[in-house]
């Protein structure tokens, strides 16, 4: 009985602590991702930089996905 009461109190305490320490409890996760999107620096992203890639039809070596080809497909030659 005492253990059950302690568990209930602990869960209520942790739930209250989560809401108290949240950054913006009014909006929750609704505006979390758009805010992060606008704060992101697109020029710092390595995904946008494909300068060191080989064009289609050039030799790329062993067949693999995500290789040196601009398309990301290496089948002996860039696809």
UniProtKB/Swiss-Prot annotation:
Expressed by the venom duct. It is found in: Secreted. Residues 1-22 form the signal peptide. The modification Pyrrolidone carboxylic acid is found at residue 51. GO terms for molecular function: ion channel inhibitor activity; toxin activity. Keywords: Cleavage on pair of basic residues, Disulfide bond, Knottin, Neurotoxin, Pyrrolidone carboxylic acid, Secreted, Signal, Toxin. It comes from the Eukaryota. Residues 23-48 form a propeptide. Pfam families: Conotoxin (PF02950). The keyword RNA-binding does not apply. Disulfide bonds join 53-70, 60-74, 69-78. The presence of a 'disulfide through disulfide knot' structurally defines this protein as a knottin. Belongs to the conotoxin O1 superfamily. This is Conotoxin VnMKLT1-01122. It comes from Conus ventricosus (Mediterranean cone).
């Amino acid at each position: 009985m005492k253990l059950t009461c302690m568990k209930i109190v602990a869960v209520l305490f942790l739930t209250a602590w989560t809401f108290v320490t949240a950054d913006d409890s009014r909006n929750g996760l609704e505006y979390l991702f758009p805010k992060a999107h606008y704060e992101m620096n697109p020029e710092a992203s390595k995904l946008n930089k494909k300068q060191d890639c080989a064009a289609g039809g050039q030799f790329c070596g062993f067949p693999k996905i995500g290789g040196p080809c601009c398309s990301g497909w290496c089948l002996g030659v860039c696809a």
